[in-house]
């Protein structure tokens, strides 16, 4: 095996790394909870709003890009 590591140690590290990666992906997926509903009419440009579960109210005004100000 690479760098003289025994096969059993290599497989243990591989399994631990794979388990940690899958657990991390599950935590992120549960935290952000994607909206999997498909709207009938797509939202107009600038209408789609997303928020994190922990942020229910905005503490500041959303920033408007310079391109949207020119319209």
Swiss-Prot record:
Induction / repression: Up-regulated in response to glucose, serum, fatty acid starvation and AMPK activation using 5-aminoimidizole-4-carboxamide-1-beta- D-riboside.
Expression across tissues: Cardiac and skeletal muscle (at protein level).
Mitochondrial intermembrane face of the membrane: 26-71
Subcellular location: Mitochondrion inner membrane
Annotated Gene Ontology cellular component terms: mitochondrial inner membrane; mitochondrion
One GO process term, biological-process aspect: mitochondrial respiratory chain complex III assembly
Topological relation to the membrane, as annotated: Single-pass type II membrane protein
Pfam family, one: DUF4516
Topology feature Mitochondrial matrix, residues: 1-8
Entry function: Required for the assembly and stability of the mitochondrial ubiquinol-cytochrome c reductase complex (complex III (CIII) or cytochrome b-c1 complex), a multisubunit transmembrane complex that is part of the mitochondrial electron transport chain (ETC) which drives oxidative phosphorylation. Mediates early complex III biogenesis. Participates in regulating the levels of electron transport chain proteins, and therefore energy supply, in response to changes in energy demand. Also required for cytochrome c oxidase complex (complex IV) assembly.
Quaternary structure, from the entry: Interacts with UQCRC1. Interacts with UQCRQ. Interacts with UQCC5. Forms a complex, named COMB/coordinator of mitochondrial CYTB biogenesis, composed of UQCC1, UQCC2, UQCC4, UQCC5 and UQCC6; stabilizes nascent cytochrome b/MT-CYB and promotes its membrane insertion. Forms a complex, named COMA, composed of UQCC1, UQCC2 and UQCC4; activates MT-CYB translation. Forms a complex, named COMC, composed of UQCC1, UQCC2; UQCC3 and UQCC4; mediates MT-CYB hemylation and association with the first nuclear-encoded complex III subunit UQCRQ. Interacts with MT-CYB.
Protein name in the entry: Ubiquinol-cytochrome c reductase complex assembly factor 6
Highest classification ranks of the organism: Eukaryota, Metazoa, Chordata, Craniata, Vertebrata
Gene name linked to the record: UQCC6
């Amino acid at each position: 095996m690479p760098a003289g590591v025994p096969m059993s140690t290599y497989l243990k590290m591989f399994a631990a790394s794979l388990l940690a990666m899958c657990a991390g992906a599950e935590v992120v997926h549960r935290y952000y909870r994607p909206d999997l509903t498909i709207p009938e009419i797509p939202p107009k440009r600038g209408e789609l709003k997303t928020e994190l579960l922990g942020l229910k109210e905005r503490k500041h005004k959303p920033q408007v890009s310079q391109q949207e100000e020119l319209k």
